[in-house]
Amino acid sequence: MSRYVFTSESVTEGHPDKICDQVSDAVLDALLAQDSSSRVACETVVNTGLCMITGEVTSKAQVDFIHLVRDVIREIGYSGARAGGFDANSCAVLVALDQQSPDIAQGVDEADDHEGDPLDKVGAGDQGIMFGYACNETPELMPLPISLAHRLSRRLAEVRHNGTLDYLLPDGKTQVSVVYENDKPVAIDTILISTQHTAEVAGLSDEQQVRERISDDLWTHVVEPATADLPLKPSKDSTRYLVNPTGKFVVGGPQGDAGLTGRKIIVDTYGGYARHGGGAFSGKDPTKVDRSAAYAARYVAKCLVAAGLAQRAEVQLSYAIGVAKPVSILVESFGTGKVSNAELTELVQQHFDLRPGAIIQQFKLREMPALSGGRFYRDTAAYGHFGRPDLKLPWEDVENKASTLLQAEASRLQQGNTL
């Protein structure tokens, strides 16, 4: 019997890097909502009293970027007397956006391998490799460690916003360690929560008393509600529970650490449980395959698992800049597939159109901001891009496609042919 512990982390929306991801995606939403053909590569930097957006944008949209940035920061919770050194109302906002390089634009606008099909005309915005993953550990077909870490982070933000724990401040991180036996989760080994807070908590100022009060409150108002519907639940008797291990966490957010777009790519995906191609998502329009192809790879992997063709599936895609069709497609089922990896790969090649133009069209990636009232990508920028029961994400809707795959495999077996 194999036994091991696997750990994943999440961060709250007030973490400096996540502020940047949300600002970058808010810029993307605003541009696409007005002009669905916008080309966007927006990077954000935050530090004490400063937020700067930079990158490349080609768009007909007219956006008040400074007002937009302040609104995002304010909604996260950095405003007023408790904002510290990063206040939405007074921080400097710098805008340094250029146009997209014409050398890149020509490859995206007119793919090298098009032969009359309009979808062949949309080439990949860059070369790269992308991975998608799914497994049957949770209802949303995500690994349990990252799923639980996100639950804790979302709940941590919720009790701050609704005033349940009014001493909490926006910055925070969670980490969950899960015990596996024979690749199945069997227990929650450790829960770690680091959360920013006011210097005084419920009339207490002694550091030890403050820490104990926060620990008790988080167990009652965060840990227990976040895990209430899980078959595996943490226990004070058997689960190691750590809160603010350094003792206190008063100085946080951009005042404590600078932030940058794209520095939480493992938090954004599978918590390290699956491989990652290295490309970030936030601030990038759908022609960037770092984003759109990673969404498609997740969709494919989730379809395979939802169809019962594998208990675990990892899908790798690769692209060349300016070329529409993927350079390669590979499925790995880690020995859990009902058929071989080669057969699963061929099934994917037959039933999924993974050209960037087709991905964009299927998931309406250019139209989603306008269809969602001007806010779509921004909501993916905190608490993960996959396995989000709180959001209606088109790449997570696999029921119909999974049924098609199951029927195709059943038909193949009936005919006695290989794929």
Curated annotation (Swiss-Prot):
Pathway: Amino-acid biosynthesis; S-adenosyl-L-methionine biosynthesis; S-adenosyl-L-methionine from L-methionine: step 1/1. Its main location: cytoplasm. SUPFAM superfamilies: S-adenosylmethionine synthetase. It catalyses: L-methionine + ATP + H2O = S-adenosyl-L-methionine + phosphate + diphosphate. Keywords: ATP-binding, Cytoplasm, Magnesium, Metal-binding, Nucleotide-binding, One-carbon metabolism, Potassium, Transferase. K(+) binds at E43. ATP binds at H15, D171, G172, K173, K248, F249, D257, R263, K264, A280, K284. Catalyzes the formation of S-adenosylmethionine (AdoMet) from methionine and ATP. The overall synthetic reaction is composed of two sequential steps, AdoMet formation and the subsequent tripolyphosphate hydrolysis which occurs prior to release of AdoMet from the enzyme. This is S-adenosylmethionine synthase. It comes from Synechococcus sp. (strain WH7803).
